[in-house]
Amino acid sequence: MHVQPPTFGEYAERAKAHGRRMAANQAILADDTVVVCNPNNPTGTLLSPNDVLRMHRDVRNSGGELIVDEAFIDYCPDATVRHHVQDGLTVVGSLTKILCIPGVRLGYICAAPEQIARLQERAVTWSLNVLASAVAAELPRHQAEIAADAQANQARAERFARCLQEMGVRVTAGRVPFLLADFGHDMTKTVQHLRAQHILVRTCDSFGLPTNYLRLAVKTDAENDLLMKVLYRENFDAR
């Protein structure tokens, strides 16, 4: 299996747990299963559908398969390739990210019929609970507000990124509900101080990044301002 860090780490962890050979920061080898997050987590990098399909063609030519994780695609729906699934191209996604209900374990897989059949043979019994099933049934009624929230998130993210950059923080932003922030120094103590104030931020060690990086969720403008105020006090007031 091939993954390219920094990215969501659980694919590599699961592969290692099942004894699969892992490759990262290396050329793609013949017969590799390549996993790419689009948009990427934590960088927010977004590939166009043409880029993804071109990648799929190259991976197939080497005898491999491509898995595209579109967990955050509701924030940039024009980039999805789930309508282009074919042999060797599998798309997985989440139905709860944009609704901010991660505790409802609900997602989907789009793949060629033969791949779906293989996955169904391995699926665990009762993989979908009644709460998740009820949420899935309601989703079609909320497509307009989901689209509106994606647009509003983009405006909040741009404002949040601009304010952090004015503080001297290097920010990587995209069409996602988070920012990757490089503070240039170890943020371990700041994370602890934030937690003591009931503010949680994501450290990035699981993505393969050093402790000067944090992934910051894009919330309301008021909540973003509160976080920036605390970050400034913790990291810049004393300078």
Regions found by a protein language model. Give the residues of each.
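Conserved PLP-anchoring active-site segment centered on the Schiff-base-forming lysine
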Residues: 1-14, 21-27
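Short acidic/glycine-enriched loop/turn segments that link adjacent beta-strands
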Residues: 103, 175-176, 208-212
